[in-house]
Amino acid sequence: RCGEGVVIVDAFLYAGERECLDIRVHELAGVVGFHVALECDRTFTNQPRAVVGVDAPNVLHGVVSLGEGITDPWQREAVQRNTLLLGLETCADDDIILLGDADEIPSASAVREAAALAAEGRQVALEQLLCLYYVNNVEFTQRWRGTQAVRYDMLKRLTPQGVRDRRNLTPYAVKDGG
């Protein structure tokens, strides 16, 4: 735990997106207690990949080794996402967990707003720009409900992948999420 009271923890899947990590850590400095970056030793297409590692302040880095056994890419991603719980074991039930991918960078102001709603026991979607392949290739007809904010007790009950699966169902959203 980082200090007294409710802690906001930023937990995300990481695949070596160093620039995204740097932006994320800088943007959320002073807002989150710590970050949890979880890396996998396999690509989405099940190819072996070298673990990049993380050298950033306030970031707990973990590596999950899935081997070749899980061949479905979405199942592999779900297992990796659910493994984020291991990096959150020191959290209290009322702590707020941000859950997303490394490139789904929330704004500090959106995190504050989402945390207030999540503290009331709600799953909150941060509506973010949907960029396809490149940061300057923006899909303007829709927003991406990537990063989610939930209390830790809700995350344990639903699982990280369960929260991800419900991201478009929650009526609670921060419109300019990052």
Q: Residues of each region from the PLM?
A:
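Short amphipathic alpha-helical segments and helix-helix/interface helices
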Residues: 22-26, 85, 111-115
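Active-site-proximal specificity loops/subdomain of glycosyltransferases
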Residues: 40-99, 108-109
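Short, conserved active-site loop motifs that form the nucleotide-linked donor/cofactor pocket
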Residues: 8, 59-60, 123
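Short, solvent-exposed loop/turn segments at secondary-structure junctions
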Residues: 15-18, 41-43, 66-68, 103-105, ...
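Conserved catalytic core of nucleotide-sugar-dependent glycosyltransferases
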Residues: 104-177
